[in-house]
């Protein structure tokens, strides 16, 4: 069919959404007259990074890297405890009408110029942050190229469990003018985020090696005071914006063999705040066993987060989880 609809819900009980509620997290319609020309409209993931476009049912290191939350509607913050809790001293506070996702439309397409060379693009417009009453939209662009096997869908996986041989490179740019205000001076603040990423999955020895890395940069107009709304009130939980603005990277790898996959992740964020305020790094190490691929598996992992903000505590987390997708 040339069109389809997708709905996804979750049970919400966190510090952003009201607890104990079932809420919609994806609700979009896809029009697909051609592979290279598709329009996705509704509540969906803005294509601001590779991890934004990685299926939540196929994350290699239990959850997404904590540094992925510096994109606009993810709260402009670092995350710890396997991406379940904000890192103290990093939170910018920006959210949209819907948390993490955004309301809007994305033009998407994928094509191949040969058996081995594949391309895809994204061009999105969304509501973005609702802190200000301005009508400025959020614009997001992404392009990706793969050599070897294609990753043709709107979403991808963080590991294909040995089913692909591919090398991919991507880049994205995400921006919204006048998305917030300086809560002290009242001056308008613009948001800009860019990232470059690399992904590889190749057979090595009796198994398959997966590797992914990305570098990201967040610009909040060099604002030093907390971000605010249209009437100057600071955004919820927001720290000085220079503790959020900055750049960082992550790298993760895993080796899949006989349904087992040991994995490791390291990430680092260097904020512009004084005296290391907003700086942090983290590593994860773990092991997964796949009963039925990504549809049924068990993961065990340990994460250590080094929060370099003065007076903040480091965080250690151990997790054991069973994951079933149907």
Descriptions of predicted regions:
Residues 1-151, 243-272, 276-283:
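Outer membrane beta-barrel
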Residues 2-4, 38, 116-120, 136-138, ...:
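Outer-membrane beta-barrel architecture
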Residues 56-62, 227-235, 279-283, 316-319:
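Flexible, surface-exposed loop regions and adjacent strand-edge segments
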Residues 112-114, 203-205, 292:
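Short polar/acidic secondary-structure junctions
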Residues 139-146, 150, 314-326:
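Outer-membrane beta-barrel "beta-signal"
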Residues 144-148, 152-272, 281:
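Detector for outer-membrane/organellar transmembrane beta-barrel domains
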């Amino acid at each position: 069919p040339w069109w389809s609809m997708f709905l996804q819900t979750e049970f919400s009980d966190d510090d952003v959404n009201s607890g104990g509620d079932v809420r919609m997290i994806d609700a979009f319609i896809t029009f697909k007259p051609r592979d290279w020309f598709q329009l996705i409209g509704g509540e969906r993931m803005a294509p601001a990074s590779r991890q934004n476009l990685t299926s939540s049912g196929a994350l290699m290191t239990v959850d997404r890297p904590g540094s992925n939350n510096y994109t606009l509607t993810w709260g402009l913050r670092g995350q710890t405890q396997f991406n379940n809790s904000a890192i103290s001293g990093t939170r910018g506070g920006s959210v949209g009408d819907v948390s993490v996702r955004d309301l809007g439309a994305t033009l998407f397409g994928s094509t191949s110029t040969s058996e081995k060379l594949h391309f895809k693009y994204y061009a999105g417009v969304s509501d973005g942050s609702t802190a200000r009453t301005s009508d400025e939209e959020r614009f997001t662009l992404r392009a990706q190229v793969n050599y070897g096997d294609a990753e043709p869908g709107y979403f991808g996986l963080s590991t294909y469990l040995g089913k692909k041989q591919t090398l991919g490179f991507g880049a994205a740019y995400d921006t919204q003018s006048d998305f917030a205000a300086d809560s002290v001076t009242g001056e308008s603040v613009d948001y800009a985020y860019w990232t470059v990423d690399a992904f590889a999955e190749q057979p090595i020895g009796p198994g398959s090696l997966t590797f992914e890395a990305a570098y990201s940069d967040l610009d909040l107009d060099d604002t030093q005071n907390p971000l605010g709304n249209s009437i100057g009130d600071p955004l919820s939980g927001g720290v000085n914006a220079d503790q959020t603005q900055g750049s960082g990277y992550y790298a993760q790898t895993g080796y899949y063999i006989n349904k087992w996959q040991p994995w490791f992740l390291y990430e680092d964020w260097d904020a512009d705040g004084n005296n290391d305020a907003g700086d942090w790094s983290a590593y994860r190490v773990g092991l997964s066993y796949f009963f039925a691929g990504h549809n049924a598996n068990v993961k065990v992992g340990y994460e250590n987060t080094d929060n370099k903000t003065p007076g903040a505590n480091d965080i250690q987390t151990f997790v054991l989880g069973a994951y079933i997708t149907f």
